[in-house]
Amino acid sequence: MANRFLRPNLIHRFSTVSPVGPPTTIIPEILSFDQPKPEVDLDLSDQARLFASVPISTLLRSTAILHATSIGPMVDLGSWLMSSKLMDTTVTRDLVLRIVKGTFYDHFCAGEDAAAAARRVSSVYESTGLKGMLVYGVEHAEDGGACDENIQKFIETVEAAKTLPSSHLSSVVVKITAICPMNVLKRVSDLLRWQYKNPNFKLPWKLNSFPVFSGLSPLYHTTSEPEPLTVEEERELEKAHERLKSVCLRCQESNVPLLIDAEDTILQPAIDYMAYWSAIMFNSDKDRPIVYNTIQAYLKDAGERLHLALRESEKMNVPIGFKLVRGAYMSSEAKLADSLGYKSPVHDTIQNTHDCYNDCMSFLMEKASNGSGIAVILATHNTDSGKLGARKASELGINKENGKIEFAQLYGMSDALSFGLKRAGFNVSKYMPYGPVDTAIPYLIRRAYENRGMMSTGALDRQLMRKELKRRVMAW
């Protein structure tokens, strides 16, 4: 049986989708490729070519910082210190933040305000040809007052983006958790899950959106029927929609794409719901969607949800953008599921995650290449996925310059992959968070843990940077 939403040059096995209520599994199983992949210029071994544009001072700092974050005990000590009560002491806090700012913060973040971040975007593009994704680095808001403050920062981000040439900037990023109170997002997610279990359950506040669940979606967070939203909760949700609408309008007027970041599964249904609502509202240009949602491929239901959302967008003739990532909340997902007596919603093995990412990537690239209103940002630090994506683009004859396909990595990480993809002719961006140093601490701790160990994401960069430094020293 064939599925028109899966890429045609693969063979898949899956079951059907029920038109009412929770669908059954449609996750594809890749059996074989029927076409050889053409060679593509994505050589990540020649450090002299990859890092030719990087000043020696930057190479020295980057090598030192990535080496420091590869030392497990150092990462553990630094994480403990930045999360400890010692940070409540003014002298200690000021000292730690000064050290962090001159090292890890400057390596992984773009600046303390929107103007500084825009300048960093320009300098990165002018020296390397890599674009920037601007994001205000606040993550969670507990009340409406904090949300009102945060939306002003996101609007400032759009205003800063408008000062940059379009060639320098890929997009701006918004976090729904920063513009809608966390308790409201959790309540909305609970109610959406309960409606998925019981389709006759009414949600009078619900607006038009795409599907946010599939047959594999984790529903264990909501074990009993939730109470309806209170009047105050409905008011807060309406305000959140207005905040999101305000930033979407500015992005639409400026023709600046807006990426909506993902969170963990306890909140993600509400985020997907709001993301798809805004896509329906603001994605009117078939060639350049404004709103992008994020799909986390480490979730077992990622493939199903992607196909269902795209199916509905095609029915409604609404273009859509997706940012595809692997995911960043593995530990918290596993702990929460275990505490409730359920299996983790994350794939059981890293290979399953790789397979899911690569399958979703290939499917999205095919959709984007056939003239449909799809745009894709392939966010990955995995070199195998980068090489596969480059080969797939060559196989499909994708126009690398039209913006329908783009690669991305975090600022300060996977530079070898970024430079290699850029040399191969692709649009490549760096995710560049900004904000006060103290607000960036949770983000920096996550980056440190990603880079720890000899087999970490930063291992290839460290190896190639050291070789390039040695080459330059020997050439003197």
Swiss-Prot record:
Co-factor requirement: FAD
Knockout consequences: No visible phenotype when grown under normal conditions. No proline hypersensitivity.
Tissues expressing the protein: Expressed in the vascular tissue and in the abscission zone of petals, sepals, stamina, pistils and siliques. Not detected in petioles.
Catalytic activity annotation: L-proline + a quinone = (S)-1-pyrroline-5-carboxylate + a quinol + H(+)
Keywords: FAD, Flavoprotein, Mitochondrion, Oxidoreductase, Proline metabolism, Stress response, Transit peptide
GO molecular function: proline dehydrogenase activity
Functional note: Converts proline to delta-1-pyrroline-5-carboxylate.
Name this protein carries in UniProt: Proline dehydrogenase 2, mitochondrial
Organism this protein belongs to: Arabidopsis thaliana (Mouse-ear cress)
